[in-house]
Design a protein with these regions (language model features):
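N-terminal cap/lid segment of alpha/beta-hydrolase-fold proteins
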Residues: 1-15
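Conserved HGGG/HGGXW glycine-rich cap/lid loop of the alpha/beta-hydrolase fold
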Residues: 14-63
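Flexible "cap/lid" loop of the alpha/beta hydrolase fold
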Residues: 105-110, 116-147
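Conserved alpha/beta-hydrolase catalytic His-Asp/Glu region
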Residues: 129-130, 145-202
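Catalytic active-site module of serine/aspartate enzymes centered on a nucleophile-bearing elbow/loop
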Residues: 237-270
Length: 270
């Protein structure tokens, strides 16, 4: 297996970092906000045993540049196509986690000839009030406090749910990289939700809806999502398959990579 390497894609709006490794049919991984391609650190080596696996940092997050304007989900979808064109990939499967799932679905809707199979992981739905909370929170972004209290605030934000200090540290590092600017991918996903219900109904490719049994827990506690708003995806894509991973959380890609990889590999083999 080829080692997983890091590289940059040059675009008119700045550079996009991506990780790539393995050989075979391509699989693109798109992370949630405000994380980065580090979200797939545990998963990539497993999937790269049989595939060419690519994970990109969404513009404005991780080690990708900040975009010069507010990006929409459609803009993020165009960056996916730009990366595929750069790598000579005509058709690929995609796994998108939460924010990345919205972008993955838009790629499949806007460029159906470029998508083989689609995996939508923990792609939650929102009502109008939740959308407003998300937009307000991420438009402001994370603020730097003079006394450094923002550092402890980010550490405490998810430590009880992530479970491992090392993983929480990685999440906080991703948080710190997007301080001082709006978190555009999260804003784009929240703004896109009503459109997503119509856009995702256009999908024809084989689609897996993968969710963690406990993925909603922290979102419900934060007032960002409710269980009763989570049926839209199956309705929008009636031909989709659905798998719920027992014990899976919002960070199950890091916490349970072997279990997630088995589900992904089994679906892609069909």
């Amino acid at each position: 297996m080829k080692p997983i390497k890091r590289a940059f894609l040059d675009t008119e709006d700045g550079q996009i970092l991506y990780r790539i490794g393995g050989e075979g049919e391509p699989l693109l991984l798109l992370h949630m906000a405000p994380r980065s391609s580090d979200e797939f650190r545990e998963l990539m080596p497993i999937l790269a045993q049989n595939r060419c696996v690519i994970a990109m940092d969404l513009m404005g997050l991780g080690d990708s540049d900040k975009p010069p304007r507010e990006y929409s989900v459609a803009d993020y979808a165009k960056t996916v196509i730009a990366l595929w064109d750069e790598l000579g990939i005509q058709k690929s499967s995609i796994l998108g986690n939460l924010t990345g799932g919205y972008i993955a679905g838009e790629v499949a809707a806007a460029y159906p000839e470029r998508v083989d199979k689609l995996i939508l992981c923990n792609v939650v739905g929102f009502d109008a009030q939740e959308q407003e909370i998300i937009l307000n929170r991420y438009t402001e972004g994370f603020k730097i406090e003079e006394d450094g209290s923002h550092l402890m605030a980010r550490w405490l934000a998810r430590v009880n749910d992530v479970g491992k200090e090392e993983l929480n540290h990685r999440c906080v590092v991703d948080d710190l990289k997007c301080f001082g600017s709006p978190i555009y991918p999260a804003m784009a996903a929240a703004s896109y939700f009503l459109d997503a219900q119509a856009r995702f109904s256009l999908l024809k490719c084989p689609t897996l809806i993968l969710s963690g049994e406990k993925a909603l827990d922290i979102l419900e506690k934060a007032g960002l999502a409710k269980a009763e708003n989570q049926f839209w995806l199956s309705k929008a894509i009636p031909h989709s398959q659905k798998v719920e991973l027992p014990g899976g959380t919002l960070w199950m890609l890091n916490q349970m990579p072997e279990e997630v990889a088995k589900i992904v590999v089994d679906f892609l083999r069909i």
